């Protein structure tokens, strides 16, 4: 069958109202259910991917390819995105759109991505854990070769001093491919975007380092194609990434002599043979979900948690540094209100969290206020405040969704702390008929009740003491909630059995069509420091956390009877907020 296809040209609107251009090549066979989404290299656009559709020769498959924001025919300043995290969210929204447009589930989607596009996709898989069938990554740009010494720190310093600016790429087509026609077309294509915003280039490095270090969180079937003679990106980071992947189905292929444009090389038939074989294997079998059943005992995060619980080597440089930090906190912490509160109630307590939400540096003197400001501006607490913003956005979205379905909106938060984020989100929501806040701490309940009274919300908000891990208590909640919120709770407990009990109770309480909003912590850059220096609410013991990958957290929610439908994550990749709908069993 002739496979040459002319694409339809359309625009897709993102959640921040940016119009992204995309091409769609419908399947040539009626009733086809396979979908492949293509992501182009940096600087390029979807018009340069026509040969992939033609040469893969899959007439039973629909293809989609976008022009990334700021590229090709898409809107936005050339080469710019507000952040790499925003571009990763674009990936999530576009793939979900492609699946919906083709009327298939995500499990029927395979993604093929090159270079910078491959980094976006790898980050999306890590941060969002989408249930697609698999992915092919070609020469991901985890570490771009900057030939000027100290270019990266110089760019970071200049960005800090000057703000946003753009760097032009002077890479010529002859360094990208041996295919003279493709090289010439790259040099002369008016839609090629030579500029890249400095924030995106710096984000690309930082995010790539995070994804490589934590690649064990990626469990989807993955094929990695590495160009053997790449002038643009380093090889070793790609290998490090691949070796840490935990998918039971993964392949690495090194293509000798290939330049950076792996899928546009002169001898690209070699790469296409590898892709065709891998994709055929993916579609030949039913989509398989990774087994997270024993993740809290045998997974990499469990091993890391046990190592952190044991502490650093005595008198090692790390141990001495942590001892110094603990001494300094005891000596100076009394002057900082935030540090003093954390040392008194636990840095993971509801009281500490509420203080972080308020974000008002306080202390007994100017020095104490300065220390407090530094404390509140740590990346972890900035992530917590962004999590609060994401919670409020999804709570409002959930209320609107329930109201649109004709369901009464009855809210419960099973571990509300002081309840500030819930009260802020629901203060002006007339559709909400009942709000129940619960917490295990008597102090949190008392302070939460005081906050409710101060806001004049006592008529429709109740705050009671309760155990968020007691399935019988949760199953018996009255009236039955249609919106349940669990924020910042499961992250504090390494064992999954407690989480399963809590989710089982909520699944019994929430009627089909109801909504669960839950948070996650798939990664944290300060995990070791927190374990070595800060104390928890658990009798002053060290605050040692086990991070759960987004895939693990989503699997617990799915097994309890909920289907995840949307997610938010901060720009540092630390905290996620997800929304799931109760299935009708």
UniProtKB/Swiss-Prot annotation:
Gene Ontology CC: one annotated term: membrane
One MF term in the entry's GO annotations: lipase activity
Signal peptide: none
Gene: ynbC
InterPro entries, A to Z: AB_hydrolase_fold, Hydrolase_4, MAG_DAG_Lipase, MeTrfase_dom_put, SAM-dependent_MTases_sf
Listed name of the protein: Uncharacterized protein YnbC
Domain of life where this protein originates: Bacteria
Family matches, as CDD domains: AdoMet_MTases (cd02440)
Protein's organism: Escherichia coli (strain K12)
């Amino acid at each position: 069958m002739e496979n040459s296809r002319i694409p339809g040209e359309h625009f897709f609107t993102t959640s921040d109202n940016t119009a992204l251009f995309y091409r769609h090549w419908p399947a040539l066979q009626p009733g086809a259910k396979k979908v492949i989404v293509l992501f182009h290299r940096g600087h390029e656009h979807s018009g340069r991917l026509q040969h992939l559709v033609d040469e893969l020769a899959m007439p039973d498959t629909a293809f989609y390819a976008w022009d990334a924001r700021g590229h090709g025919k898409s809107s936005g300043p050339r080469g710019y995105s507000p952040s790499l995290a925003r571009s990763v969210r674009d990936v999530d929204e576009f793939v979900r759109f492609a699946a919906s447009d083709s009327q298939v589930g995500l499990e029927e989607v395979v993604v093929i991505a090159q270079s910078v596009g491959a980094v976006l996709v790898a980050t999306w898989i890590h941060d969002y854990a989408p249930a697609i069938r698999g992915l092919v990554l070609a020469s991901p740009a985890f570490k771009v070769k900057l030939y000027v010494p100290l270019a990266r720190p110089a760019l970071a310093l200049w960005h800090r001093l000057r703000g946003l600016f753009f760097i032009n790429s002077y890479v010529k087509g002859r360094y990208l491919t041996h295919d003279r026609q493709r090289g010439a077309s790259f040099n002369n294509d008016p839609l090629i975007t030579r500029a890249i915003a400095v924030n995106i280039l710096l984000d690309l490095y930082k995010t790539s380092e995070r994804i490589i270090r934590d690649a064990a969180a990626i469990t989807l079937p993955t094929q990695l194609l590495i160009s053997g003679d790449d002038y643009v990106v380093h090889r070793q980071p790609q290998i490090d990434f691949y070796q840490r992947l935990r998918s039971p189905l993964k392949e690495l292929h090194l293509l000798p002599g290939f330049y950076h444009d792996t899928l546009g090389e002169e001898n690209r038939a070699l790469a296409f043979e590898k892709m065709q074989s891998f994709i055929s294997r993916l579609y030949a079998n039913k989509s398989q979900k990774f087994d997270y059943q024993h993740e809290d005992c045998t997974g990499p995060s469990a091993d890391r948690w046990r190592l952190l619980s044991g502490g650093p080597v005595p008198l090692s440089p790390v141990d001495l540094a942590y001892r110094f930090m603990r001494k300094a906190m005891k000596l100076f912490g009394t002057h900082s209100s935030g540090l003093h509160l954390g040392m008194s109630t636990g840095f993971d307590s509801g009281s500490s969290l509420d203080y972080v939400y308020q974000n008002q540096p306080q202390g007994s003197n100017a020095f104490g206020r300065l220390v407090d400001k530094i404390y509140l501006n740590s990346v972890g607490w900035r992530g917590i405040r962004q999590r609060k913003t994401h919670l409020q956005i999804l709570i409002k979205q959930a209320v609107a969704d329930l109201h649109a379905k004709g369901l009464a909106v009855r809210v419960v938060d099973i571990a509300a702390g002081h309840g500030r984020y819930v009260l802020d989100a629901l203060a002006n929501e007339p559709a909400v008929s009942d709000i129940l806040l619960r917490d295990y701490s008597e102090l949190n309940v008392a302070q939460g009740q005081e906050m409710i009274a101060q806001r004049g919300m006592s008529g429709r908000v109740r705050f009671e003491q309760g155990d968020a891990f007691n399935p019988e208590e949760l199953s018996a909640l009255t009236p039955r909630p249609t919106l349940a919120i669990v924020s910042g709770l499961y992250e504090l407990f390494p064992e999954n059995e407690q989480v399963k009990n809590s989710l089982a109770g909520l699944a019994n309480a929430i009627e089909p069509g109801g909504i669960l909003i839950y948070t996650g912590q798939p990664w944290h850059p300060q995990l070791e420091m927190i374990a070595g220096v800060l104390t928890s609410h658990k009798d002053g013991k060290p605050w040692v956390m086990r991070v759960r990958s987004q895939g693990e957290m989503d699997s617990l929610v799915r097994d309890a009877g909920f289907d995840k439908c949307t997610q938010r994550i901060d720009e540092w990749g630390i905290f996620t907020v997800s929304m799931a709908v109760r299935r009708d069993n």
